[in-house]
């Protein structure tokens, strides 16, 4: 069925309204970038136990792709970040996770916002969004931008280390690949 120009224009306008409602506003995007920067500063500043591992914080997933949308039935956006450290694979996943947890917990602002998740630590910001931060190390088996993230039951990570493993992933190259189709 072929649409008239008027009907096509109406559908385009409707889709644009839906997209605007689902994505971060410019203000929210600016706030999220500010939070990424503040977390990165806290993790890498002088006195941080992570500083010696050269922490690099970067967005991943929809935030990296610029396609962030509010999940259906949720009032907040789900933003994802990686905290890549130069630590070796000799680290146990639970130890690395705990190191990141302890550093975030040392900040009185972040402490009440923190929640343990299987592969990340969630900071629940009031209202607009939460930020999931996954600790990571380089994946020597894959090279390039590949990283290893903990795949663990966060509550049992240190008590039952045999149940926790590293999971290989490559969010940077994945985002670049997807972006190559659109930009």
Indicate residue ranges for each PLM-predicted region.
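Conserved catalytic core of two-metal-ion nucleotidyltransferases
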Residues: 43-49, 97-155, 159-162, 166-169, ...
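Short beta-strand-to-loop capping motifs
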Residues: 83-87
């Amino acid at each position: 069925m072929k649409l008239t120009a008027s009907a096509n224009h109406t559908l385009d306008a409707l889709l644009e309204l839906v997209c605007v409602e689902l994505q971060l506003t410019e203000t929210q995007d600016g706030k999220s970038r500010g939070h990424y920067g503040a977390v990165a500063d806290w993790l890498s500043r002088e006195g941080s136990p992570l500083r010696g591992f050269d922490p690099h914080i970067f967005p991943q997933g929809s935030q990296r792709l610029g396609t962030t949308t509010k999940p259906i039935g949720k009032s907040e956006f789900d933003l994802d970040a990686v905290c890549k450290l130069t630590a070796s694979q000799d680290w146990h996943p639970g130890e690395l996770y705990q190191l990141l947890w302890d550093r975030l917990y040392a900040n009185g602002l972040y402490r009440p916002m923190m929640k343990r998740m299987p592969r990340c630590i969630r900071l629940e910001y009031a209202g607009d969004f939460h930020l999931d931060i996954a600790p990571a190390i380089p994946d020597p088996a894959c090279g390039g931008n590949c990283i290893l993230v903990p795949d663990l039951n966060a509550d049992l990570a240190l008590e039952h280390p045999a149940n926790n493993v590293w999971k290989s992933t490559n969010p940077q190259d994945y985002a670049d690949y997807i972006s190559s189709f659109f930009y």
